[in-house]
Each structure stands twice: as C-alpha cells, then as structure tokens.
C-alpha cells in the first residue's frame, strides 16, 4: 500500500492548539482544539474531513490543561467519552460526549502513581471504566478499574 500526502485545507485559528482530537458524535464529525490556557473549541467537520472554522459547536474552558486526549465508547450503555490527562499535574479528567458533540465533565481525579507514568489510556470493558498506565523508568504497567459508587 502506498500513501500520497496532499493538502485538502489550510486556514488559521486564533489560538494554537497543542492538544487536538477528531471524533464522531451523532453520526457527524467534529474537531476539538485545546490550548494550554485550558480553553477549547469544538468545530464541525465536513464528510470530506475539512474543519469548518466558522461553525463552533461548543467552546469554553476545561478544568485542567490536558496534554493528551482520546475518545472511547461504552458499547453497553451506548455512550461516548473523552478522557484526557496531564502527567505533570497528575490529573485525569473524563467528559461525556453528547450526540450534539457538547462535553460535560463526569469524573476528575488527582492521582499518585507507583512509578513515573509516561504512557496512559482509558478503555471500557463490560461497562467498567479502566485506566492503563506504564512507567518509562521501570517499564511496570498497571490497570486500574474506576468504579462509580
């Protein structure tokens, strides 16, 4: 398989977004840009993969600047979530993504770790939210269950 890179769109945002995510909600595509001042913007995306910079779905400030964000889906409850973490501040935030692409904070935790974490991801198995981490120093890894009670 061969790939050829071609430019399909170029534009300018008012902010620099060091953390970004493209995701799907309600059968539509969206782009989230998140800046170090904790602000974020969610933009509509076309079916051709182009960002519509004038169509802002939601904007605001997150609780924390998140260095990495990902989306994951709970098949048992048909809900989608966005999670992010800041390894410097040792913070994990989980947001629920609505069908209209708006996000609402569902869970936030300041965490302590057994080692120095440099890798992390969330996933859901049988309706249980799990968090994987790995230390770059010791190579030890851990899986935690985050149980709602």
Regions inferred by a protein language model and the residue ranges of each:
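Repeated scaffold domains used in trafficking and secretory/extracellular systems
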Residues: 12-26, 61-74, 113-125
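Surface-exposed loop and turn segments in beta-propeller and other repeat-based domains
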Residues: 3-12, 56-63, 109-113
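Blade-level signature of beta-propeller repeat domains, shared across WD40, Kelch, NHL, RCC1
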Residues: 119-149
């Amino acid at each position: 398989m061969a790939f050829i890179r071609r430019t399909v769109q170029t534009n300018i945002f008012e902010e620099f977004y060091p953390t970004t995510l493209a995701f799907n909600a309600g059968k539509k595509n969206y782009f989230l840009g998140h800046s170090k001042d904790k602000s974020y913007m969610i933009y509509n995306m076309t079916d051709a993969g182009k960002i519509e910079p004038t169509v802002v779905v939601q904007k605001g400030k997150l609780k924390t600047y998140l260095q990495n964000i990902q989306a994951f889906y709970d098949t048992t409850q048909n809900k989608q979530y966005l999670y992010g973490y800041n390894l410097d501040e040792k913070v994990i935030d989980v947001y629920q993504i609505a069908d209209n692409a708006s996000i609402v904070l569902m869970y936030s935790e300041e965490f302590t770790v057994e080692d120095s974490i440099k890798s992390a991801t969330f996933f859901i198995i049988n309706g249980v939210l799990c968090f994987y981490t790995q230390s770059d120093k010791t190579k030890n890894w851990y899986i935690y269950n985050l149980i709602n009670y």
